[in-house]
Amino acid sequence: LYQARYVAGEWSGDLWAYDTEDTVTPIWKATDVMPAPNSRNLMYGADSGAAKAFTWSNLSAAEKTLLGDTSTVLDYLRGDTTLEKRNPGGIYRNRGKILGDLVNSSPELVEAPYDLSYHRYNWTGASSYRSFIEGAAKTRTPMLYVGGNDGMLHGFNANTGVEVMGYIPKAVMAPLPSDTVSVLKKALAIE
């Protein structure tokens, strides 16, 4: 059982997993096992149309301008808390957790595919279906995908809760810097 969570006053979120026999104590909480900011596998929809690693060096001049021409905004969005207002010299909004609020997005579990006997049909690709489900797809890691108002579609290992990836669509790049300022200017991004 998976539950998306959020704290409205601070606009932070979490993803919890429960055993169906014990719905009181979580098996894991995603924010307890989040990778360090610079270790997160974050991608974004670049101006070029390709997905690129969400790093300052990968941004075009126009994309850097969207983020205010400072790498500290990107660092904040990756989860760096150094420049949050609670710290000396901090200028960005405090967050309870680095995972954005998961309000109207339900976690979607993606596991190994079921054999739906598509191989018996004659449309393109049908004959290779059995090879697909009996190959690498059979042992793929179960993943949970959920959209957050931190502007990312997150992918978590469903067994451990560790974030495996995050994707920021190009369409939400422009409002992201407003998330650093105040909860009153918080953009509702990926729901």
Can you name each region flagged by the protein language model?
Residues L1-E191:
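A fold-level detector for beta-propeller and closely related beta-sheet-rich head/sensor domains
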